[in-house]
Design a protein with these regions (language model features):
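Gly/serine-rich nucleotide phosphate-binding loop at the start of the catalytic core
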Residues: 1-53, 58
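Short, flexible segments with low predicted structural confidence
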Residues: 2-5, 130, 145, 170-171
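Short, charged/polar micro-motifs that form catalytic or ligand-binding hotspots
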Residues: 3, 18-22, 38, 106-110, ...
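Short, contiguous clusters of charged residues that form electrostatic/catalytic patches at enzyme active sites
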Residues: 15, 115-118, 164-171
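Alpha-helix C-cap/termination motif
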Residues: 23, 35, 76-77, 176, ...
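A generic secondary-structure signal
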Residues: 35, 68-72, 168-176
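Active-site-proximal, Lys/Arg-enriched surface segment
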Residues: 52-139, 144, 149
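An internal, acidic/charged active-site-proximal segment
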Residues: 146-226
């Protein structure tokens, strides 16, 4: 309760998380209300809508509390071995959810209408735990101040590339003293040479996927001048 501010938010938080895990096609508030409280759907809809849209609580504090509770259990099976950078797409049918746009959705394996979140998970061979999570805000959203205000997005939420978000998360994890692991990145991130250099600058070892047409030069060599 301490991390969400008020005791009366505990029930909506539980119901919202339950709704996200239920096998309903749409993960918006209305269908979630119907499956989590079928006997009082209208009241549940208002409760969840207020919690998600107007309730003030820190997602970072929630993640920190989860990490405090779960990380010791993971480390019982062995030390943290990897920091995994990835993004997750959430298919959407409408246009009002924050950050929704036509973009690549890994869940569908193609471009489609979706939201995308960049995450950093810490893991060993037994389990993984999301340590940082941020919604990617496409430029078409970041440049539309009226759309941002209507959706309740904070004024200081500017545009950042997915690579910049990933680097922010890795830098934060280093500063926060999370147990170190090898940074793992797929080609969507690993093919960015600036990101790889910045990760090295953080003192991290990384294993990164790259595209098959990437040119690689041995250390100390390079292309001849034109």
């Amino acid at each position: 309760v301490g991390v969400i501010g008020h005791a009366d938010r505990a029930r909506p938080l539980r119901d919202y998380c339950l709704g996200l895990m239920m096998p309903c096609e749409r993960k918006s508030v209305e269908p979630m209300a119907a499956v989590t409280a079928p006997e009082r759907t209208a009241a549940q809809h208002q409760s969840l809508l207020h919690f998600v849209g107007e309730g003030r609580w820190s997602d970072e504090m929630v993640l920190a509390k989860v990490r405090e509770m779960v990380l010791p259990e993971i480390e019982r099976h062995g030390p943290i071995e990897a920091w995994i950078i990835d993004d997750t797409g959430f298919p959407k049918k409408g246009t009002h959810s924050v950050g929704v746009a036509r973009q690549y959705c890994g869940q569908l394996g193609k471009e489609d209408n979706c939201q995308v979140a960049v995450s950093l998970s810490i893991a060993n061979a037994d389990a993984s735990l999301p340590a940082a999570y941020r919604l990617y805000l496409p430029q078409e959203w970041a440049k539309d101040s009226a759309r941002l205000r209507k959706a309740g997005v904070p004024d200081d939420a500017g545009f950042k590339t997915k690579h910049e978000i990933a680097l922010d998360q890795l830098r934060w994890a280093c500063e926060a003293g999370l147990p170190r692991g090898v940074a793992l990145l797929d080609a969507g991130y690993g093919n960015n040479s600036e990101l790889r250099a910045d990760i090295t600058g953080l003192g991290l070892t990384y294993v990164a996927g790259i595209l098959s047409n990437t040119t690689v030069w041995p250390r100390g060599t390079g292309p001849l001048p034109p």
